[in-house]
């Protein structure tokens, strides 16, 4: 009788090509997503060594990091030039490399273009039980549909392009179980912020986290993708949520998803992708969903999380000297004083978007708060950036764009946008941004930018009041 296995172990075992004496395994990669920032050197390496792409049919290229979110075509439909030379060069390289190596390429002006981690599941290219890699740290996002997905470096991008495999050490396993019902105003983003604050930014180091429990199962696929997206912020290699009927309903009929008898066979296999009764994890964390409130970050690490009803902590309250020093440094950068009520912190900028929170459910949540309201006079810059052209079209069909525009926010084209300072969307130095993205590192949204991570509804609430606000106060 085989021993009970976790979901991670099942997917791992199914992809082992070769096991080595030191425990390292050669793993087959089912799907490879490529974008413009981490791929130029990889393609150059292939070209220099005379190699081809081993499985172009398992590879999909999408530009997302550097693309501007302002209009990309003029009135005549001609493509507008990219102002930044480095960005223009990277985008041009991907546009040249993908067809040269026989890789499917979604053009920057194609209707289905978007953030790679939104496009993958949306197109059905990402599937349960698959191994998925991308030269991007937030590849863990695809774990929301039950895929083992993780980010890789540029040299590994080249290796996967050439061989469709990677040499990897197996990870430890960790369960984060969230049981019970969440309260009003609490979203998937609040759940993962709370988890990150609980386990810490290094809590999952060396592990793959499986998110379980009734609160996780109750989430939509959009919510599950948000959870897995930020597994890396808890230090984990990847995040996983077991596929179920919600997953199958989401994927059915998508362009790259299996069809007909292949679909039936796939679902039959996907149903086996659950952790066996009796399987053990290396680490287990249990969280009561009732303890989770609308949350916000105060510092420069994703673990710096408090409820919106809380206050800025005093560095002296940290017993660990390194954390005490980090907290003091964070507060100096963020321009905050210990004891300040989070609801008294003003914000000048609002960003609703990123691979964490730019799907249709996220935009609906923000629009529900903004409907019939206007952004506060103190908010200088507020943008809504859909995760893909298909999300944008759906939002416009539902009239969400009009709600955002009428509220005084800008409605943009799809892309990574202000999540990271690699395109024109940057937060000015010394100013704050209520952001639905995943990282609040020093300079992440621009040199000197001060980031507060929140949910889409919380970002919308901040837009209305001009300060960090408990969205529950604005809910009907």
Curated annotation (Swiss-Prot):
Main enzyme class: lyase
Cofactor: how bound: Binds 1 [4Fe-4S] cluster per subunit.
InterPro entries: 3-IsopropMal_deHydase_lsu (IPR004430), Acnase/IPM_dHydase_lsu_aba_1/3 (IPR015931), Acoase/IPM_deHydtase_lsu_aba (IPR001030), Aconitase_4Fe-4S_BS (IPR018136), Aconitase_4Fe-4S_dom (IPR036008), IPM_dehydratase_rel_enz (IPR050067), IPMI_cat (IPR033941)
Organism per entry: Sphingopyxis alaskensis (strain DSM 13593 / LMG 18877 / RB2256) (Sphingomonas alaskensis)
Keywords recorded for this protein, A-Z: 4Fe-4S, Amino-acid biosynthesis, Branched-chain amino acid biosynthesis, Iron, Iron-sulfur, Leucine biosynthesis, Lyase, Metal-binding
Requisite cofactors: [4Fe-4S] cluster
Pathway connected to this protein: Amino-acid biosynthesis; L-leucine biosynthesis; L-leucine from 3-methyl-2-oxobutanoate: step 2/4
The protein's name in its UniProt record: 3-isopropylmalate dehydratase large subunit
One Pfam family this sequence matches: Aconitase
Described function: Catalyzes the isomerization between 2-isopropylmalate and 3-isopropylmalate, via the formation of 2-isopropylmaleate.
One example GO MF annotation: 3-isopropylmalate dehydratase activity
Reactions this protein catalyses: (2R,3S)-3-isopropylmalate = (2S)-2-isopropylmalate
Superkingdom, taxonomy of origin: Bacteria
Family assignment from sequence similarity: Belongs to the aconitase/IPM isomerase family. LeuC type 1 subfamily.
Subunit structure: Heterodimer of LeuC and LeuD.
Keyword 4Fe-4S annotated: yes
Gene Ontology terms: biological process: L-leucine biosynthetic process
Protein EC: 4.2.1.33
Residues annotated as binding [4Fe-4S] cluster: 355, 416, 419
HAMAP family tied to this protein: LeuC_type1
